[in-house]
């Protein structure tokens, strides 16, 4: 039976292994309905930074805060890997291409938000991602039933937007009430250093 998980977090379980994209992934679900789901992986930083994006798009950034220039881009998923989007808290600004989500979040795919960021006009929280993840109708439901994903509706913006990516999966897991030991028990095998 279909269940809407929009605005929830997917945590890859140890059953997803040897998958370069989804192993130990934390996915924020932006959209989920009977036709499918769309989400962004939020814990897989790439080598490219916002400075690289500003230079490629010829966005002036001489006055941009250094820490903003060093923000990594995140691999949002395998679909459209060259499309940049900003997952962010709403800040009262109206951008050309914004989809408002729940919990005061939005996703914007237009250059005007990048220009604002380059000018240090920042949302409270934001995460630049390239690409996205997609599931067809019933695909995500089937993967959840197969225990590939733990779903949590315990959204915490500080954890969601935190740049400590090596522990983001575990932090979300713990925030959802799980431990590495409980995963061992749940999956009846040793997950090692998940």
From Swiss-Prot:
Gene3D superfamilies: VC0467-like, VC0467-like domains. Pfam families: DUF179. InterPro entries: AlgH-like (IPR003774). Coiled coil: none annotated. GO terms for cellular component: cytosol. Belongs to the UPF0301 (AlgH) family. This is UPF0301 protein FTM_0963. The lineage of its organism: Bacteria, Pseudomonadati, Pseudomonadota, Gammaproteobacteria, Thiotrichales.
């Amino acid at each position: 039976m279909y269940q809407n998980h929009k605005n929830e977090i997917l945590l890859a379980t140890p059953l997803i292994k040897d998958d370069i994209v989804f192993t130990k992934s934390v996915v924020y679900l932006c959209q989920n309905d009977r036709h499918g789901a769309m989400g962004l992986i939020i814990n897989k930083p790439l080598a490219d930074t916002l400075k690289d994006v500003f230079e490629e798009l010829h966005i002036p950034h001489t006055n941009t805060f250094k820490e903003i220039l060093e923000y990594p881009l995140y691999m949002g998923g395998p679909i459209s890997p060259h499309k940049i989007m900003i997952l962010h808290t709403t800040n009262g600004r109206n951008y050309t291409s914004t989809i408002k989500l729940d919990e005061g979040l939005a996703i914007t795919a237009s250059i005007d938000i990048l220009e604002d960021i380059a000018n240090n006009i920042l949302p409270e929280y934001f995460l630049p991602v390239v690409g996205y993840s997609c599931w067809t109708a019933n695909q995500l439901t089937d993967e959840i039933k197969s225990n590939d994903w733990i779903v949590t509706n315990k959204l915490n913006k500080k954890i969601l937007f935190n740049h400590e990516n090596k522990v983001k999966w575990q932090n979300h897991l713990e925030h959802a009430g799980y431990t590495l030991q409980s995963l061992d028990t749940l999956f009846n095998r040793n997950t090692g250093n998940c």
